Design a protein with these regions (language model features):
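Short helix-boundary/capping micro-motifs
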Residues: 11-32
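Central regulatory/effector-binding core of bacterial HTH transcription factors
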Residues: 91-154, 222
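Secondary-structure junction motif
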Residues: 176-177, 191-212, 280-289, 295-304
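A late-sequence structural motif
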Residues: 106, 257-299
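Beta-alpha-beta core module
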Residues: 154-160, 164, 179-180, 226-276
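Flexible hinge/capping segments at coil-to-helix
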Residues: 153-192, 197
Length: 304
């Protein structure tokens, strides 16, 4: 019978595409890794790995086995977690992913509140690209994440929490910044800055530019909301910044001017995400509820 250990070794090889690096990742020798994978192939009666390729490639059936192995290993980890936490309540470490366009402006207070309410739990927060973190979540490298929608992925529970308003800001010396009320046609042809194209924010700004008849400045991609604000303040273009960032101590409007635009109601939907059937579902729901409550309080809107 194929063992969980052999499946772990196969997944490691799929991730690293190199026998030595995969062996190091699972703390065994390279010969042991090769021997165990050959034993797995013999047991299944198929070839899983094309060994003459560099980097190592999986056969078509190998890719299918890896996909199933990832799910098996995640399910086993959830069962082990459930057993370890039986009767323990909220405790342990939760690996939490969040987009950098949200985490720094919302999570600090939530983490502190969570630790006060549940002293035996630790929220390990890591920033990343939402679509990439969704894949990490699916394979068990993350336990929970906070992300703008839409989000792609299978076997994920998506819990919408709140809508965050988005605002157009301009260089303070630009002519439209002097107007008490800005019309959409005033922004036709204007250049808009955005995050790099891996972020939801890039796609949303692109769609808004299309709606306004504005131009997305492909040559200027920010790595953070701070960099967007600074580039905008320097006169490089307009930007679209979320409400929580503008309300935060690290953000604000000291370098830019928020525009009062007629007929403007752009926003983004924020959701908590975890694996369907995860052992800690009740804990994740508690954290999601705390995030929703905190966000609604900051934004000054009632819970639905």
């Amino acid at each position: 019978m194929s063992t969980l250990r052999q499946l772990t070794y196969l997944v490691a090889l799929a991730d690293y595409r190199n026998f030595r690096r995969a062996a190091d990742a699972v703390n065994i020798s390279q010969p042991t890794l090769s021997q165990q994978l050959r034993a797995l192939e013999a047991r299944l009666g198929v070839t899983l790995v094309e060994r003459n390729e560099s980097p190592v490639q999986l056969t078509p059936v190998g890719r299918e086995v890896v996909a199933r192995a990832r799910k098996i290993l995640v399910d086993v980890r959830d069962v082990e977690d459930m057993s370890a936490r039986a009767g323990a309540g909220m405790s342990g470490t939760i690996r939490f992913g969040v987009t950098p366009t949200l985490g720094p402006y919302l999570m600090a207070g939530i983490v502190a509140s969570l630790h006060r309410r549940f002293p035996d739990i630790r929220l390990y927060v890591r920033e990343g690209i939402p679509d990439e973190q969704a894949r990490e979540l699916a394979r068990g490298d993350l336990d929970m994440m906070l992300s703008p929608l839409p989000l792609s992925g299978s076997n994920l529970h998506i819990e919408p929490l709140f809508r965050e308003p988005l605002h157009i800001v301009s260089p303070p010396e630009h002519r439209v910044a002097q107007a008490a009320l800005v019309r959409r046609e005033d922004l036709a042809g204007a250049g808009f800055l955005s995050m790099d194209r891996r972020h939801h924010a890039h796609r949303q700004v692109r769609d808004i530019c299309t709606e306004l008849g504005a131009e997305l400045l492909e040559d200027y991609e920010g790595t953070s909301l701070d960099s967007l604000r600074q580039m905008c303040g320097s006169g490089l273009g307009f930007a679209i910044l979320p409400e929580l960032y503008l309300r935060s101590e690290v953000g604000g409007e000291d370098m830019v001017k928020r525009l009062a635009l007629t007929d403007w109601s752009a926003s983004r939907s924020i959701a908590a995400v975890w694996r369907e059937g995860a052992a800690y579902t009740a804990s994740y729901q508690t954290i999601a509820d705390m995030i929703a409550t905190a966000a609604h309080e900051i934004l000054g809107v009632p819970m639905a």
